[in-house]
């Protein structure tokens, strides 16, 4: 994203490309293992129930598996998902995707699994 790359801290980013909604098998686990000093991961994204969920859960489960006291924080105002009403889905041959419902269900599920879902970052 050009907006993120324009921030003054952009030189500190580590960009790990991926080819699907999954965060597994892309080198993220190896990077996390090589950087035990990272205590907090902040997750943002454009599909709460897809990529964002996969990333947050991958980070949380990795920390659990390796007994790390690493925080995974997801600001609610930095995620959202899309909506496809039933009638539109029927017309285009897709599954309905109730955006508001999925957004809140997946936020709840992440919180239930140890991701710190917060309203916003201060």
Per-region residue spans from a language model:
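Active-site-adjacent betaalpha module
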Residues: 1-122
